Amino acid sequence: MSILVLWLAFFLQTEPLSAVRQSPAAVASQASPDAVDWNTARELAPGIRLHQDALTAPRPIRRCVARIDLEQPGLRLTTTPRLDAWQNNSKETRRQTARNFLRSERERLRPVMLAFNADAFSPWPVPFDQETETNLLGFAVSDGQLVSTGSGTPSFIRLKSGAARMQVTDAAMTADDIEVAVSGFAFCLLDGVVQPSGDDLHPRTALGLSADGRWLLVLIVDGRRHSSAGATTAELGQWLLELGADDGINMDGGGSSTLCWWNPQLPGDDKSELLNRPVGNGLKLLTPVADQRGVSERANGNNVGVYFQSP
């Protein structure tokens, strides 16, 4: 029995011998996609368009990119609210999968159309889809309320005025005049310059912002699959640059990377639909058979929702 278990583990998780690692610079240059024609991209809602593609070089890579017009009348952002019994830097939010977050916001009569994961968080005990209390790692604001203090990492911030920016935030940062804020690990793109990185490949979530602050780009890269091996953070920066961003942040990734929306065309009451193929259970599905195992969703410490409110 032990031999069978070991063989199955090898079959499901071993990377093919043909996979070759290259330098981050070489990978970024080879993986550059053609420019996206956003005028013909799929419109999910007014001001929200979706582009999906599958690259074959330098490795199989499947990407989802949502472009959000922050100047679209009535467009609002929200995030996971802080706990009623909130304790700063200890117990700040309750984990939810991105789809459960979308569902719960709609139950609150807030018609979220698009949702995605954001901040890193700890702890995240197994099973990874359980809704437990957790602490966010970085500055976070939800509907004007401070959720987590800054820790010297870059943040995406949208003010109550509608203006947006990306900046490094520390413990002195307050929630004054801020609608929402989420934080990531590091800049992958800064002032139009792609930031260097290692060559580790993972599922990724990245946020990009155009120089004028109008366009928010949400880039999700699937990984740990035979059909999509993941990306480096330098690749994220290169792609965001080509997609029109001036700054970009590498957010929480791995099994947390999720993009979903409310598809009004689906039958039944639950119209939440995944747009990527997350690996929330932490498994590596690196053979064709394993890749057919489907998807698993992780409960994240912070999710972002896009909805519309009458101006």
Provide a role label for each language-model segment.
Residues 1-6:
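Sec-dependent signal peptide recognition
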Residues 7-149:
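Zymogen propeptides
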Residues 49-67, 179, 183-213:
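Conserved beta-alpha junction segments in alpha/beta enzyme cores
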Residues 69-71, 157-163, 169-171, 209-214, ...:
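Short acidic-glycine loop/turn motifs at beta-strand connectors
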Residues 80-88, 171-174, 220-225:
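Short, solvent-exposed aromatic-acidic interface loops
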Residues 116-200:
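Active-site-adjacent helix-turn-beta-strand microarchitecture at beta-sheet edges
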Residues 125-150, 193-211, 215-246, 256-311:
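Conserved, well-ordered active-site substructure
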